[in-house]
């Protein structure tokens, strides 16, 4: 078993995962992750937080939020292929992992989007593969447990298109056939958002019956890798995310699940950073409740992609440098404001609700490195500070 001793002091209550409710109060050392984790997945059951997959491969770690001095403890390895971007949520005392993307076998020529589902049982510290397939590709989707024991899932890449594109790309030697390679990339990346056929249903999985259903259609463009915060029982805020590869949206939507259906409401967009810098939107941002507000921090985008899309150039990020953002926004239920900055640009990590702020865990930095650090964004409704 692997536990981490090195830790950071956080004079806060112990955090809950951003998409979970509740918090554990304590005054303890908060340990960094055992390894850097980006593009992974996380969930919480009671006082136990679980994080893994992504850049950690099949590794899976747990932290007792009532006793964080024990550090992150290695749990049973994930039994499926190493996967990025899986949708993960807890229900009925177990953790469910859906889809994601990666190579089906180590010698596979190209990655695919998986249509598999797995369950982790903390009691036996074991994984099992479920006898089901996801109805659509769910890589990049967000999953959240509902009060009735089911799991709702938002967004997700189209498996058929994604698999074919990566197989075609993998079959071309871009050094020997640069024109053919460029033509293929331009063709795929130059499509309008609707052409990618991302999942536009709010899917629901019922662990008790091992079956799938729908809570209705998303009336907006479906997106992947949005930031997500739980606002209350059955209420979820989805912020920004991709609407096609390389192009984000600044939109935010409130989803209320009532009487077996998802009801959508558009709320204020993320604000411009300045008069000269329009809001590009972000993918892979951190989000959670901080007091009465929602904080959204970091994420990644391509500066100039919105202008290209507005001009009809749908390969919107062509030639643009990827930017890992350090901006932090606060939402009071009506309006957004720029709250402050992260210590560095970060995206694709995990976020934990904590009394007084938002705990930022791992992620990817501007060099593409997976980070281990954990720090608290403290927010009192007026001023943002960083506590290491």
From Swiss-Prot:
Active site positions, chain numbering: 242
Primary location group: periplasm
Single Gene Ontology MF annotation: racemase and epimerase activity, acting on carbohydrates and derivatives
Pfam family, one: NANM
EC number: 5.1.3.24
Catalytic function, reaction form: N-acetyl-alpha-neuraminate = N-acetyl-beta-neuraminate
InterPro entries: Kelch-typ_b-propeller, NANM, NanM_proteobact
Keyword line: Carbohydrate metabolism, Isomerase, Kelch repeat, Periplasm, Repeat, Signal
Family, as annotated: Belongs to the NanM family.
Compartments it resides in: Periplasm
GO cellular component terms, semicolon-separated: periplasmic space
Source organism of the structure: Brucella melitensis biotype 1 (strain ATCC 23456 / CCUG 17765 / NCTC 10094 / 16M)
Chain positions of Kelch repeats: 48-92, 94-147, 149-186, 187-232, 236-285, 307-356, 358-387
Quaternary structure and interacting proteins, as annotated: Homodimer.
Region forming the signal peptide: 1-26
Gene name as annotated: nanM
Stated name of the protein: N-acetylneuraminate epimerase
Stated role: Converts alpha-N-acetylneuranimic acid (Neu5Ac) to the beta-anomer, accelerating the equilibrium between the alpha- and beta-anomers. Probably facilitates sialidase-negative bacteria to compete successfully for limited amounts of extracellular Neu5Ac, which is likely taken up in the beta-anomer. In addition, the rapid removal of sialic acid from solution might be advantageous to the bacterium to damp down host responses.
